[in-house]
């Protein structure tokens, strides 16, 4: 997770647009209370204050939410109506949403999935279902992929050992901490992309717990990366090897080793979890397996070549 640029607009601009809309659409079910709060000079000062508190907490948002009480309303505005304000003023046609999307032009800042393979959404870092006061706050809205958004759902790290990571303030280079564990089940490989053990990563215990909470509990990246490794990376390796003709176990192992040595350090320095990096992790784990792993690879190669022959005839 790389740190990204903060939004170019603040809550005052959002409130200004909301107030202007409500003044022109007084039949709206939220118009009365919004105009009343605005005219009594309570609306903008309140949201300016929570934005300021959020920014002050910054990379330690857990310290902010530990002081907050959960509420079903904000200045008398029901939680459901705060959600409606978000849906209206951050709709797919909204300039606010477009501006936030521009902050992550290439990929999801959480899992590094590239757009085109993943779909943009806006994620409430502090969930609107729990903290409605942050529902329309720009600094609480991050452009992430659909999978990360819905994996997180309403999970919040209230404890110091859990924490809350927001890409506007925090960054984590996951690559040095990841390892692939592969084993054979039946006639297939099972892969798990997991965090290395605490004893070998060199982090203090609190940071390691926060990293594990982020990786496994909040965004479930272990599940996402493991699935990609099994379905995409392994299949791609088999496809590539199947085009080489007959290969020995020693050839396969040597080919794997050269790919690992050539790529790993450069990939880690970039700090992005790409297919190439996952491939290196898978190759490392395959090298740790016994000869039966290479026998299974050769059987898979034979099956893949037979499939290719059938496809060519078809």
Residue ranges and their predicted role:
Residues 1-93:
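N-terminal accessory alpha/beta regions
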Residues 2-31, 202-314:
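C-terminal, charged low-complexity interaction regions
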Residues 4, 8-11, 36, 40, ...:
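Soluble regions of membrane-associated proteins that transit the secretory/organelle pathway
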Residues 47, 61-68, 82, 159, ...:
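Extended hydrophobic/Leu-rich segments
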Residues 84-97, 123-130:
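Short Cys/His-rich Zn2+-coordinating modules
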Residues 96-120, 145:
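Short cysteine-rich loop/turn motifs with clustered Cys
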Residues 116-202:
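Glycine- and acidic-residue-rich phosphate-binding/metal-coordinating active-site segment common to enzymes
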């Amino acid at each position: 997770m790389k740190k990204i640029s903060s939004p170019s607009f603040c809550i005052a601009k959002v409130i200004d647009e909301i107030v202007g809309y409500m003044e022109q659409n007084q039949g709206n079910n939220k118009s009365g209370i919004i105009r009343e709060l605005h005219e009594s000079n309570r609306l903008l000062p309140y949201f300016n204050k929570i934005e300021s508190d959020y920014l002050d907490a910054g990379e330690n948002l857990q310290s902010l939410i530990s002081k907050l009480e959960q509420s079903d309303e904000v200045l008398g505005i029901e939680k459901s109506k705060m959600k409606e304000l978000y849906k209206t003023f951050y709709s797919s046609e909204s300039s606010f949403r477009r501006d936030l999307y521009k902050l992550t032009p290439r990929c999801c800042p959480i899992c590094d999935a590239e757009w085109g393979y993943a779909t943009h959404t806006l994620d409430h870092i502090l969930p609107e279902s729990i903290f409605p006061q942050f529902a329309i706050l720009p600094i609480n809205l991050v452009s992430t992929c659909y999978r990360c958004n819905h994996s997180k759902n309403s999970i919040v790290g209230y404890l110091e050992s859990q924490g809350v990571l927001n890409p506007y303030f925090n960054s984590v280079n996951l690559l040095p901490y990841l390892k692939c564990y592969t084993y054979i089940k039946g006639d297939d490989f099972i892969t798990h992309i997991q965090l290395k053990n605490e004893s070998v990563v060199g982090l203090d215990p609190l940071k390691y717990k926060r990293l594990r909470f982020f990786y496994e509990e909040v965004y479930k990246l272990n599940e996402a990366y493991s699935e990609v490794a099994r379905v995409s990376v392994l299949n791609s390796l088999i496809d590539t090897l199947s085009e080489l003709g007959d290969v020995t176990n020693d050839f396969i192992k040597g080919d794997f080793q050269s790919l690992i040595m050539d790529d790993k350090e450069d990939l880690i320095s970039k700090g992005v979890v790409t297919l190439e990096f996952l491939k290196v992790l898978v190759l490392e784990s395959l090298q740790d397996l016994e000869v039966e792993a290479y026998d299974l690879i050769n059987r898979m190669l034979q099956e893949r070549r037979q499939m290719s022959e059938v496809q060519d005839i078809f």
